[in-house]
Amino acid sequence: MSLRSVLVAALAALAVATPVPENSLQERQLMSSNDVEDGVCRDVTFIFARGSTEQGNMGFVVGPEVCTSLKADLGSGKVACQGVGGAYTASLAPNFLSANTDPQSIQAATDLFEKAVANCPNTQIVAGGYSQGSAVMDNSIQALPADIQEKVKGVVLFGFTRNLQDNGQIPNYPKEDVKVYCALGDLVCSGTLIITPAHMTYGVNAGDAAQFLASKVQ
């Protein structure tokens, strides 16, 4: 069996083993947020890309918790939240590409940044990504046009799959505006795609991440 096959099996096994909320309509809604798609304008817009195999467009490991914490910090009426969906299906195979995701997933994130700025020109954007979603955000943000990128005030990355390759930062984006969370024992942050239980622990960082993002827009 090839190393790639072993890693795919490990990712799939972990996805099956990870507890997922029951498939009720209410719980699925908690894993999705579509404020940008729905044309909602707030002072702050949070755009998040979930990890591989996560349900909804926000996932369940950390995305919804950051959104909730950010609303608690800034006021629920001041924050819009949007998950990256559409062409970003969070499937496993794109992790093995050179960008650790695929072009259509990167474009899905870029489209949301562009839509947020076009529809809500006064909003301040903050962003986040987990696992494959961190690669989606990394690749999208570094290539944004300057007038759109300057609207992105802060980014949080959890289990950053390109942490080693990109030196713990997003190329062509201010390092001080990025906070990377890499749990002890998460081998993904060491340049591998080997999934360990540590990779699923980033919910504990949601509050701190929200505080970091809030500090960038206050």
From Swiss-Prot:
SMART domains: Cutinase
Keywords: Disulfide bond, Hydrolase, Secreted, Serine esterase, Signal
Cystine crosslinks: 41-120, 67-81, 182-189
Higher taxonomy: Eukaryota, Fungi, Dikarya, Ascomycota, Pezizomycotina
The EC number(s) this enzyme carries: 3.1.1.74
Organism field: Aspergillus terreus (strain NIH 2624 / FGSC A1156)
Protein's cellular compartments: Secreted
Pfam families noted in UniProt: Cutinase (PF01083)
Marked site positions, Transition state stabilizer: 52, 132
Protein name: Probable cutinase 3
Functional note: Catalyzes the hydrolysis of complex carboxylic polyesters found in the cell wall of plants. Degrades cutin, a macromolecule that forms the structure of the plant cuticle.
